[in-house]
């Protein structure tokens, strides 16, 4: 028996995605993220992730 009403499960949601988007909108944070990674760049601009 297949339940066709539910479809595929929802993809995993990254809890840091909203912060990643904030960093991407700041050109300086985005550039730093390319060099050292998003979490370190975000920490330097906005504090802890």
From Swiss-Prot:
InterPro entries: GLA-like_dom_SF (IPR035972), GLA_domain (IPR000294), Osteocalcin (IPR039176), Osteocalcin/MGP (IPR002384)
Record: residues binding Ca(2+) 2: 21, 24
Gene: BGLAP
Post-translational modification: Gamma-carboxyglutamic acid residues are formed by vitamin K dependent carboxylation. These residues are essential for the binding of calcium.
UniProt: Ca(2+) 1 binding residues: 17
Gene Ontology MF, one: structural constituent of bone
S-S bridge residues: 23-29
Compartmental location: Secreted
TM helices/strands, residue ranges: none
Record's keyword terms, sorted: Biomineralization, Calcium, Disulfide bond, Gamma-carboxyglutamic acid, Hormone, Hydroxylation, Metal-binding, Secreted
GO biological process terms held by the UniProt record: biomineral tissue development; bone development; brain development; cellular response to insulin stimulus; cognition; glucose homeostasis; learning or memory; negative regulation of bone development
Signal peptide span: none
Free-text function comment from the UniProt entry: The carboxylated form is one of the main organic components of the bone matrix, which constitutes 1-2% of the total bone protein: it acts as a negative regulator of bone formation and is required to limit bone formation without impairing bone resorption or mineralization. The carboxylated form binds strongly to apatite and calcium.
Native source organism of the sequence: Camelus bactrianus
Residue intervals of the Gla domain: 1-47
Homology family: Belongs to the osteocalcin/matrix Gla protein family.
Residues annotated with 4-hydroxyproline modification: 9
GO cellular component, one term: extracellular region
Chain residues that bind Ca(2+) 3: 24, 30
Chain positions with 4-carboxyglutamate modification: 17, 21, 24
The name this protein goes by in its record: Osteocalcin
